[in-house]
Amino acid sequence: MKHLTLYISLFYLIGCNLFQGQQQAGESVAVEEKQVEVFVPVQKELYVIKEGAIKYKIPDINVKAQSQYSYGEPLWVVGVSKHFYKCNEGNEEEYILKEDADNYEKLKLTQEELEESNFILKGRQKNSTTGSLSTYLSISLITKQEYQKAIKNKVDFFIRDTLTFQKKDKVLSIVCEEAVVKFKDIIGELSRVDESYEYIGRIDTLNQYVVSSQVGDGYGEITIDKRSGRKITFDHLPFISPNRKHLFMITTEIYSEPDNFSLYKVESTNPFVSKLIITAELSNWKIYNIEENDVFFSKNGYLYASINPINSFLDSKGELNKQRMYIKIGIRN
């Protein structure tokens, strides 16, 4: 009986010690989970590389997320810990998991994402659809080296010629075979909107003269048919395919607004007649800078452009992002 009592006592003591050991170990894990993140000061720019990455107000994964970052969003990082980056957002501090942010080079756009649109208008239809542009275009990422090689074979039908037609008494007269087209500058306090026009050149392959226009804060180009004098206004001169069968016109918007483009089929060059195929708004990327000859057709028939993901168009300082990607666009006949 004494032996039985002794065994029971020993089992009780062993069980208590084991329970206390497990409890202490559990308490140790809890302490580790609540460990304070220690941040080391840094100064660098990173980008969100995960769609739906969580934006933390405090560096604690157990805190319920209030909002999310957008893919490609630039971050100005001011601190780094074991698990988090500390970011400056205006006058506030935000935190993102280290695995969700990296250098610009880690950003990727798939062909499906490049060909995605917010809307597509076919011809002159008013009802739009959404979806892929793959029926009309093939768009793919390329290397900078391929882009630079293609620019050596750039095709440009625009001939700069500013002397053929010049203004006289603020009036620019474009003499065509069947008409004289006049543009008058309107500049002064009495006019609600200033207007200014300059002859800048011609596109012989389409039998067009080209006039640049500034109306208020808006800029554009006007083509004038050399024979009839018919005018067509563009936000930017269209890019002409090497086989002269298509026109590709891009309308770029500042900051984070999506870019639009229109694809035309050339039905006649004399007189110049074109048919609108589609107008679309791009979903995921923007042209880097259309004014610096970053967009061009090459002899192989592809349109080349330098771009940025739409959320990376501006850097963390709100300035035009100097980093960029490169694409080529093929027109499906």
What label would you give each PLM region?
Residues 109-213:
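Terminal domain-start segments
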Residues 23-39, 88-138:
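Boundary regions of SH3-family modules and the immediately adjacent low-complexity/disordered segments
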Residues 211-216, 249-255, 260-262, 305-311:
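Beta-strand C-termini and the immediately following turn/loop, strongest in propeller blades
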Residues 170-190, 215-233, 262-282, 316-333:
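Surface-exposed loop/turn elements that mediate protein-protein interactions on large endomembrane-trafficking
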Residues 166, 200-206, 238-250, 294-303:
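Blade-terminus and WD-like Trp-Asp/Gly-His loop motifs, strongest in beta-propeller folds
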Residues 26-84, 120-130, 175-189:
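Beta-loop motif signature
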Residues 1-14:
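Sec-dependent bacterial lipoprotein signal peptides
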Residues 17-20:
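Bacterial signal peptide processing site
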